[in-house]
Amino acid sequence: MSDVWGYTDETGIEYAIVGYQNGTSIINISEESPIEAGNIIGPSTGDYYFHRDYKTYGDFLYIVNEMYGGDIGMQVIDLSPLPHSPPIQLQTYNYIGQSHNLWIDPSGYAFIEHQSGDNIHIADLSNPSSPTYYGTFGTQAQNCHDIFTQDNIAYVSEGWSNQFGIYDISNLNNITQLAIIPCQGYAHNAWTNTDGNILVTTEETDGMTIKIWDIEDFDNINLIGEYLGENNLAHNVHIKENFIYISHYTTGIKIIDIFNPTYPVEVAAYDTYLENDLGGFFGCWGAYPFTENGYIYASDMQYGLYVLDFNEVNAGWVNGHIYFNNTIPFENTSIRSILNNKVYYTNNNGSFDIGFPSGNHMFIVNEQDTIQINFLPHQITTQDIFIGNELIPGDINQDTLIDILDVIIIINIVLNNYEPSNQEFWVSDMNFDGIINIQDIILIVQLILDN
């Protein structure tokens, strides 16, 4: 399967719209067992991925594709016969050929990525059953791969131009550039929040993060947050309320809370691709979160359509310090989540800053001590944590024994071959004079001999 979209008919029945090799399947998902309510045949010759993209406008579905053979162009489908009769293809708008992506603005214009002509093609949907040619972006927004519009602003992902373009489309006869955001990868897809002050972008390039931009001022755009899943390759993002919904290829679908956009937090995930979490263009292609019943549709290229239920979980953020023996900062040490095995670290003064799904969660510090941290929904709180048994002077490696291993460590400290942590310094300073030297070595050796 390729991309996925959704539609709700006049009776409230909801449908998933998904692409496959020979066309488009329209699936009634309101039943316990989803059933196909319509099948639209389309061009079927092309590459392995069967690129198809969908948007709806009222009771009409518009389909573009990158395939060959058959009637090439934008298919116009009347969905109003549902649920009693199958949808009907009215025509193919053939002012364009192959296309990877389209977007329909609420004002009634379709913006279509045009692979073989005018780049971004604009169609007028005043009569939605019979689109007419309106115009283009001209020489602007070249190499368009994806387009999204909101509030008379177009956000164009400009592919191998390595940039995301922002354009004023309030006058379609005089489209003007407002800003450019350069990127190092392939500018693949972009989406804004409802307020239009946050833009999230993907680059569909191995190792390139999903980026969160503050676009409150187009003259002063700033990168404020980043995220990337385990496979290091993301496909597309959509935003609904405070959540980013990511089709993340082999790791499936990811849901990220951006209530605090400077610290995005993964709050839910579902692995649609069962083979592995390695890189590569396999797995989850599309994610559609805009259903009325709260379900999420996910299309997986190998495993088909998933209908998922998200019991909304908000993120919380906790910062503080971890102390050993009540006063000594536990510096540069691991804090591993028992829930998902993710590892965080304290810095060199023992402080930590963790974002996590809300609730009480258990962590293991330094692979030794189990602690509990309480994350409150959409709140930033402070929690200092005190762990461990009392530190024993001379037990530098903290194995509860004072032996030759500790002598080796303190000798290396004195010779400046090893930089001790706060804990190690405290237990090495045997005479508590604030200096580690030969006197401390002698005192540790004396302890060993006495024992």
Predicted features, each with a name:
Residues 329-330, 337-357, 373:
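Short, acidic Ser/Thr/Gly-rich low-complexity loop/linker segments typical of extracellular
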Residues 318-334, 397-401:
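Structural motif
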Residues 1-326, 344:
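Feature marking well-ordered beta-strand scaffolds used for ligand recognition
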Residues 332-333, 398-422, 432-451:
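Alpha-helical segments with a strong preference for the paired helices of cellulosomal dockerin domains
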Residues 358-369:
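A short, solvent-exposed beta-strand micro-motif common in secreted/extracellular proteins
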Residues 124, 168, 257, 391-401, ...:
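Acidic, divalent-cation-chelating loop motifs in proteins
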Residues 367-390:
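Structured interaction patches on ligand/partner-binding surfaces of diverse proteins
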